[in-house]
Amino acid sequence: MSNKMWGGRFTDRPDAIMEEINVSIDVDRHLYAQDIAASKAHAAMLAAQGIITANDAKNIGKGLDTILSEIGAGKFTFKRALEDIHMNVESRLAELIGPAAGRLHTARSRNDQVATDFRLYVRDVLDETDAALAAFQFALAERALEQADTVMPGFTHLQTAQPVTFGHHLMAYVEMAARDRGRFQDARKRLNESPLGAAALAGTSFPIDRHATAQKLGFVRPMANSLDAVSDRDFVLETLSAASICAVHLSRFAEEIVIWTSPLVGLIRLSDKFTTGSSIMPQKRNPDAAELVRAKTGRVIGALNGLLIVMKGLPLAYQKDMQEDKQGAMEGFAALSLAIRAMTGMVRDLVPEHDRMRAAAGEGYATATDLADWLVRTLKMPFRDAHHVTGRIVGLAAKQGLALHELPLAEMQAVEKRITRDALAVLSVESSVKSRTSYGGTAPKNVRAQAKAWLKRLEKERKLG
């Protein structure tokens, strides 16, 4: 005869392999706080509706508080034989308060119970991620304001393209993080409905108040369809999707840090706090933190892909496949959290090599577009013609191994006789970045204004939050 809490129907014990594949406590034990909170809300509602007595609800609440304290203090023994967090908590509750513990599961199934727990868990993840990204943005904006005048090369195809400011580059990631936060915040809005009370799939015949439990747990409303409530994990998928996009942004920045810290490039330095050495090469300073951020992106994207594959063929309602929704997601969320914190630390730590940045900004004829723009503005030349003329001038300079501003004026005039000495003034990298005053451009005054605006906005969020 089965000794399981669901075992009344069964006459034989599960096979040992069945026990092994069925158990989930190693993963869902991380839902203990959410499980206890949902159970307390459910018990209070049952009493308010006259389904259980007020005294039973009181004892259930006290017992659950004791269990919460035991788990928090590391004094709770999780038992694999009890399968999951729900049964572990209920079993311990029975030890503490006796038969009244058996009334807790009235009008509830593990199907709506776990859906509620996981929504609460993911909601906490969303809030923590939003706060971490806000701190990342603040660090970026602070450094951007500090480095608003620092000229560096801007790249396309990893080739020098046009001069930009380091502050402008950092502010690009502030904007990306803002969109990431928007996606997480939007996901939270759709997540924030309560499955509790949907029971196994069809609802319950007991006169429960789902609005009361939803309100108690901070949800906006109960989910409107009991089948939907227990059978979908789109809230996890949406969060992992937003997490994957965010991780890609972090990975791109991490890749830049890896490139920029290479002695062959040398645009920035990281301190010993975010680098490691080699076991054989004593001179090495490796940007391991950035490399690991880059790698952890795969963990996040892998979690999304894994859950998509789990869910893609499941008919309604609950299927045991959905027990596999948590481990990958939890690992993905943890990887993203660590990556955000590591990138925030590196942003605060990195030191720009100003001289090297300035020199690199002028390499590769990076101010050629400024010359083309001068031809358009001053000589009223169509841009396509100006592009062609400038390309010929760049070719002359390259053939002689000269920077653009080093090419004699006479040779420029051999290509376009109307070019004057005034054109030389636009060829410095400082002049180039200062001229990019269009909205969103790299001009230092733009960067300062944007960085200050973001710092003010983020500080206001801190005070309100």
Curated annotation (Swiss-Prot):
One of its GO terms (cellular component) is cytosol. It catalyses: 2-(N(omega)-L-arginino)succinate = fumarate + L-arginine. It comes from the Bacteria. Signal peptide: none annotated. Its main location: cytoplasm. GO terms for biological process: arginine biosynthetic process via ornithine; L-arginine biosynthetic process. It is found in: Cytoplasm. InterPro entries: Arg_succ_lyase_C (IPR029419), Argininosuccinate_lyase (IPR009049), Fumarase/histidase_N (IPR024083), Fumarate_lyase_CS (IPR020557), Fumarate_lyase_fam (IPR000362), Fumarate_lyase_N (IPR022761), L-Aspartase-like (IPR008948). Keywords: Amino-acid biosynthesis, Arginine biosynthesis, Cytoplasm, Lyase. Pathway: Amino-acid biosynthesis; L-arginine biosynthesis; L-arginine from L-ornithine and carbamoyl phosphate: step 3/3. Its EC number is 4.3.2.1. PROSITE patterns: FUMARATE_LYASES (PS00163). It holds the Pfam family Lyase_1. One of its GO terms (molecular function) is argininosuccinate lyase activity. HAMAP family: Arg_succ_lyase (MF_00006). Belongs to the lyase 1 family. Argininosuccinate lyase subfamily. This is Argininosuccinate lyase. The gene is argH.
